Amino acid sequence: MRQSGNEQEVIILGSGLGGLAAGTLLSKNNRSVLLLREKRYQPSYPTQGYHFVPFSNFSEKRIGPSFLKKISNALNLQLLMGNREEVKQTRISSDQSKQKAAFQVVLPKSRIDIFPQRSLSQKEWKREFPKEFIEIEKFYDELNQTQHLLQKVDRKKNASSFFPLRKHSLISGLFPFDSLPKGKMDEKLSPFSRAFREFIQLQLISWGNLFSERFPVPLAGHIFSSETDALSIDVDLEKLEKEIVSEFLRSGGRIEEIDKVKKINLGWRKGFTLSLEGDPRVFQSKFLIFNSPLHQISSLLGKKGKELLKWGEKIRPLYVMIPLFLGVREKVIPVGMKDLLVSMLDLDKPYDNGNVLFLSLSPKGDETKAPEGRRALTVESMMDVGKWEETLLVDYQQEVMKHLYHIIPFLEHYTEFVDFQWASDHVPNWSYSHFLYKVTSDFYWREGVVPVKMSKNIYFVGKENFPYLGLEGEIFSGLSAAQEILKNESWPNFIRP
């Protein structure tokens, strides 16, 4: 049923990938959907012939062909599915990409490439961790066996191929006949050196947004499998987002830009009424989907938002990720440096204050991202969430640059510009979603941390649902929310191939 004006069936507050996926699926099923997007927030930054896109994790930079196929099937994105010849070329490209590193991990005394092929990775482990090589082989064998077991269990249960979800039930809670290993990664890694433990930990947080020393072993196996599947094809987060927005609008969805929601009132019959700051417009809907960081919107419902506050206590942002943009000359990039890289300068220090950096280089020769002979370098560092207001960005930038000079010698002589202005302008916004989270209690990784359905007609879609899964978790949450609203009894059929 379509409605007009400022009354609609569903309002989505925020414009992340999860919300866009939910809105597109709902619109395709003839539901009236309004997406409210923050006017001041720009997800990318074009300047001086360069094009920068801040990111939360590497899953936003490398979208694997199998994952892309699932999204395309779920939302019927024809431009992403392509014709037979394009699919054939993608398979050829994927085969060639198996010889290329997905990304690179840099430690004080090590530089390790992550390859899709086990034989290539073995050479890396043997070179950088020769004394532990035999035990490392056994460690990866166990992870592979766990992943195969997970796939076997889900095939028997006819589970969703999008993500190995386990639906919660009273019976499964009382009698958890789950044959997957119950161990945690800190226990598995305890015999290894500090360097190898950090090597594994950095990989786990590089693909998602959760910091934890106690990752469940099956979850680690799933994440490593996703990393090696993410072979380089010509689709990144920005391109995917544009295609989903186009499909959302084609299906009848609407987008309005706002400054900020002032208050949300919940009426017994009329549903939700949203009033805005500095704007006379009022929006009403039956269903409400929050698609902004939980800690940014938990107070909007006042006393009726107890569920938001409760789950906001279970998962909290530990670090805010701060982007720094550099225009650099191609000749300064070291031989062997990959386009995606995570680096830790000091193993004995925390991750913040420039000690851990995530780097993303624009593809060599891509003049849509940087002028000829130049590269766009996006650097994500971490800052304690509580220190943003009191930190001088000039001093903070110096710490980040010291680390960068260590990774890229002579960088200061080949840098066109360094830009921190986008971060200064955008980090305070309610749409800013680049955080590394921590959980305050145990969770079932196959059920998620924060539920998609908060209470009657209120849904939450964001990184906090499945913070360890990166882009996969966001898309899955959005599609799940839409499926709940559509009241389809099956779970969720639309994401099967």
PLM segments and residue spans:
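N-terminal glycine-rich phosphate/pyrophosphate-binding loop and immediately adjacent elements
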Residues: 2-148
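General small-molecule cofactor/ligand-binding pocket signal
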Residues: 80-82, 254-256, 416, 459
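Mid-domain catalytic core of redox enzymes
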Residues: 107, 229-232, 262-372
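Active-site/ligand-binding neighborhood in enzyme catalytic cores
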Residues: 144-251, 258, 435-441
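A glycine-rich dinucleotide-binding beta-alpha-beta segment and adjacent secondary-structure elements
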Residues: 197-207, 410-468
